[in-house]
Amino acid sequence: MFSIYFVFSQQRLSQWPLRKQIIIMKFYNREKEVAELKRVQELAFTQNSRMIVVTGRRRIGKTSLIKEALKGTPTVYLFIGRKAESILVTDFVKIARETLSIFVPEGIPTFTNLMQYLFEVGKTRAFNIVIDEFQEFYNIRPDVFSDMQNLWDEYKQETKINLVISGSVYSLMQKIFTDHNEPLFGRADNILCLRAFKIGVLKQIMEDLASGYSNDDLLLYTR
C-alpha cells in the first residue's frame, strides 16, 4: 500500500544519499487501522450509517491513512479550517457537487444545513463523508456538535453513509466523543488513536528512504 505519509523536509533530504530520486512513500505498520476503517465502511454501505473517529497529533498520518482506506469509493472530504462558517460551506457545496455529481443548491447557510442535505442523499446512495479537524468547530460554532448529534440520531438507521471524523487536538476530540456531558458521547462506533511509530519501525523507514541517517536524524521523528 503506497501513499504520502512519512514527510521529510527538502533541506534534510538533501543531506542524505537517497536510493532513488523519486521517493515512493508507503504505509508502515498501519495495516490494522486500514482494515478497521474498511470494515466500518463495509457495514455502513451494506447495513446503515456508521461513525468512526480518528485522532492523533498533527503530521502523524491521519489523512493519508483515511484516504488509503477509502480509496476507490466516493468520498466527500471536508477540511475544517479556521474560517467563517459561510466560507467553509460555500467551498463544501462545490466539493459535494464534484465528488457525488449531484445538484446541491446555492445559498445553503450553515454546515448543519449542508450535512442534512447530504444525509438526505444518503438515503438513496452509499458514500463516505470525511470531516477533518472536526474540533475546530469549537472556534467556529460550537452548536455544530449538538446539531450533528440530532442529525445522526435522526438519519443513522435510514442512510448508508460512512462518516469519518478526524482531529489533531487529542484532548478536545476525547472530550467531544467520550465525555458523558457532550452531545456526541456514545455516537462513534469506534475511535482510532494513531500513535507515533516505535523505534524499530522508524529505523525501517529511515533505512528505506535515507540509509545514511544518523542517530540525531532518527531523534527528530521520535519526539
Give the location of each predicted region.
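Phosphate-binding site recognition
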Residues: 1-223
